[in-house]
Amino acid sequence: MNNYIFIISAPSGAGKSSLLKAFLATDIGKDNYAVAISHTTREPRVGEINSREYYFVTVAEFEQLLSQDGFIEYAKVFKNYYGTSKAELDRLLALGKNIILEIDWQGAQQTRAIYGDRAKSIFILPPSLDELRKRLEKRNTDSKETIDYRMEQVQSEISHADEYDYLLVNDDFSQSLEQLCKYFEQNIQS
């Protein structure tokens, strides 16, 4: 099987994680895909478990892996490091799965530079900035200051959307999930 790497990026609150979770519960998703678990230096949110959502590490641990060229991509986002390790990608490729990377635009650029056409990319957009703010407030995981900071960064993130192979506006969740499933199906058959 020729494995692909699918890069999924979106501003915080656009619905990326919810769409991926729903996709991975579908027949095509659970049988053919695996999400690479990223390393991060941020604190776990309530309910997050180490090695399920992220590998939670200290700044020193992250920087040590970085100095050993242990990441295929990394970035500092919202004052925290995030990165996908080479070991994680090797682990998933050995399972014969297509890999999904939930990463930002900086990581997407780095990954495409390494994997070229083998890396497909999707950018998920919110229907509007007002809706995005409502979603961030509704999930009740960030302070007002953090939400304000995230909203300040949105324009910069969205300015890179044209670098992606496919743009998906997540307005209606069911329709967005259907479009995402079609995109994945078409791209493993091509």
Curated annotation (Swiss-Prot):
UniProt entry keywords in alphabetical sequence: ATP-binding, Cytoplasm, Kinase, Nucleotide-binding, Transferase
GO molecular function, one term: ATP binding
Domain Guanylate kinase-like: 3-185
UniProt KW Zinc keyword: no
UniProt KW ATP-binding keyword: yes
PROSITE patterns named among the record's database cross-references: GUANYLATE_KINASE_2
InterPro entries xref list: GK/Ca_channel_bsu (IPR008145), Guanylate_kin-like_dom (IPR008144), Guanylate_kinase (IPR017665), P-loop_NTPase (IPR027417)
The reaction(s) this protein catalyses: GMP + ATP = GDP + ADP
Family: Belongs to the guanylate kinase family.
PANTHER family registered for this protein in UniProt: GUANYLATE KINASE, GUANYLATE KINASE-RELATED
HAMAP family given in the database record: Guanylate_kinase
Listed name of the protein: Guanylate kinase
